[in-house]
């Protein structure tokens, strides 16, 4: 489903974000990516969705190159990829419902979504998504009146409304307390198991990675240094991922 072929990313100042990455991700996997801050985890996810261009190599999504896609082709590929960010990326002054409905924007011309011309079916999808994350009672609440955990669950409902094949979650629990973090991860696991969505999540917490990941990818200094089943991954492997390098930060925040 997702193929990275000899992918490298070098920033303008010479910092290496990714170095010769080769990776295959199959449909329906729940993958956690771990490593020090600056190791290349966020660069990896942002490259898959082409939020940034790679310097070398190719990224294939369902047989189509997102690296070279343009215009309509690029929009169609991205429509199948949902993003969840550490900072939630909600419109704070808008209602929860309006934020969740933005998951449908990839299906319409810009002018329709600008004027909030969503269909009754879209609104029903949004409401059902909020039910799945236990926030149906917050439909008309402004996003900035919610707790951090609730805002992240709104972001998950938005992704569910989008109905993508792939979810890329970039440190989705970094700013949350342990209990709320676990709830957010349970919601992501629900999307994976019940809807068949492929999930790739960057995590700082090794504990959460062990609890929810089926496969773990270790990243250090822009390179994949480990790739294996979680059930076969020892604590010593995690220790090596985090301590085996010099830990220098690159030009990214995770």
UniProtKB/Swiss-Prot annotation:
Chief location: membrane
Reactions catalysed: phosphonate(out) + ATP + H2O = phosphonate(in) + ADP + phosphate + H(+)
Binding site for ATP: 35-42
Keyword flag Nucleotide-binding: yes
Enzyme Commission numbers on file: 7.3.2.2
Record text on subunit structure and interactions: The complex is composed of two ATP-binding proteins (PhnC), two transmembrane proteins (PhnE) and a solute-binding protein (PhnD).
Listed name of the protein: Phosphonates import ATP-binding protein PhnC
Native species: Lactobacillus johnsonii (strain CNCM I-12250 / La1 / NCC 533)
């Amino acid at each position: 489903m997702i193929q990275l072929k000899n992918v490298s990313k070098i920033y303008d100042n010479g910092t290496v974000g990714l170095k010769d990455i080769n990776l295959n991700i199959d449909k329906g996997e729940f993958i956690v990516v771990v490593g020090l801050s600056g190791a290349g985890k966020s660069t990896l996810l942002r490259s898959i969705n082409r939020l940034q261009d790679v310097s070398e190599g190719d990224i294939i999504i369902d047989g189509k190159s997102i690296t070279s896609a343009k215009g309509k082709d690029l929009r169609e590929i991205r429509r199948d990829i949902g993003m969840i960010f550490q900072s939630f990326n909600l419109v704070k002054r808008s209602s929860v419902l309006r934020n969740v409905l933005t998951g449908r924007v990839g299906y319409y011309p810009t002018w329709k979504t600008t004027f909030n011309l969503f269909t009754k079916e879209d609104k029903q999808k949004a409401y059902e998504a909020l039910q799945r994350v236990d926030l149906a009672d917050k439909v008309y609440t402004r996003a900035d009146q919610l707790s951090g955990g609730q805002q992240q669950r709104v972001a998950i409902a938005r992704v569910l409304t989008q109905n993508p094949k792939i979810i890329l979650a970039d440190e989705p629990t970094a700013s949350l307390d342990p209990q709320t973090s676990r709830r957010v991860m349970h919601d992501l696991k629900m999307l994976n198991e019940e809807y068949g969505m492929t999930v790739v999540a960057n995590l700082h917490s090794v504990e959460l990675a062990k609890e929810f990941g089926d496969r773990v990818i270790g990243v250090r200094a822009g390179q994949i240094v480990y790739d294996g089943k979680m059930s076969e991954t020892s604590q010593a492997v995690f220790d090596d991922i985090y301590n085996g390098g010099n830990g220098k930060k690159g030009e990214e925040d995770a």
